[in-house]
Amino acid sequence: MNTNDIWLIAGLGNPEAKYDGTRHNAGFAALDYLSGKWGISVSKTKFQGLWGQGEVDGHKVVLLKPLTYMNLSGDSIAPMAGFFKIPADHVIVLCDDITQNPGKLRIRPSGSAGGHNGLKSIIARLGGDGFPRIRIGVGAKPRPDYDLADWVLGKFPAEDAKAITDRYADLEAAANLIMDGKLSLAQSKYNG
């Protein structure tokens, strides 16, 4: 293992139990899947987050669930990245995406926040948008006048939850490809 090959994978969400199973916590749920699959316990506390570290296919990996609430996610991610000297392009963010149908993945190497306040916070705290992200489709509001906060903080219907969990293996494979330096391949194989 190359000692400089370290990655931070952060799943975004809100920390209280009442938010479990909500659209906005899709990143937390995906990180829980990776934690279980990779055998990395996310139970230590540091920099306003729950974290753990391990090795995945030769890569040193730090998994993080910021406990700052969604809109302040950068307040946990940036100090954690700084502590481990992880450059922004080795920070992979998992988050919800209301512009994609449930279960659709959208992998990007960088880009704007696209209206996502968690990403906005991370961009501000890291000082740029040059970090990869895997956005998890949670579905759009049912109608334009539907309150956005009510929508993202609402629970998934069973069929939407299944559409998302059915993509966890693809999300894991995409994260592995990104860590292997094959982000473009991850996009072509798993976007959509």
Residue ranges and their predicted role:
Residues 114-118:
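Hydrophobic alpha-helical segments within soluble ligand-binding/sensing domains
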Residues 1-110, 120-134, 141-147, 154, ...:
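Nucleotide and nucleotide-moiety/phosphate-recognizing core
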